[in-house]
């Protein structure tokens, strides 16, 4: 089902406001603001009638420590406290979270892929990180979860395990809906698959919207729950479509 809010609502994501103005060709030109300061800026924008919604990667909000995959559940942890402080600020501004997405590209652990990493232990770690992201989204009342292909791709065709790699991806995405059901998260109205033809990998496993639709309809357990985030002016534009 098409969600008109994705085009009707004005939104500004955490990662745009927090960007230190770096790019692949040069480093940051200003310090990255703290996530709580970003939340305050976004809440102020909402109060001034400039935006209605925001979105975030899990790593935009709090740091991730693979040694403590459930720190968001520990009332004594800084992550637990930070998330609730962010939630309070956003609520005071009347700002809603439209979408959360799990960063499976920022850590060097996932250089060879997140959900499709050839190392089963790293795939399992990626799944734990996705679970944490879904819990964060539940806390903040996110409407959607988005999977971006990120590092799930390849550079060398001959070294890629095509006999299994799409099975691993399906397993990872089916785990999303399975975990939402297991935890009885009712805030999520759906999830989306966000394709990209290349970057940061040489080639992606889900390069276009057509590939995304085909994968959803043929490989996922609950296709009706999934949609496509086409990034028409960004990722899809890279394919010259």
Task: Give residue ranges: language-model regions.
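Buried hydrophobic side chains on well-structured beta-strands
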Residues: 54, 147, 191-193
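N-terminal pre-domain/capping segments
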Residues: 1-139, 144, 174, 223-225
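Acidic/histidine-rich catalytic cores of soluble enzymes
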Residues: 156-241
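Short, flexible helix-coil linker/hinge segments at the edges of structured domains or between repeats
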Residues: 106-120, 145, 151-169
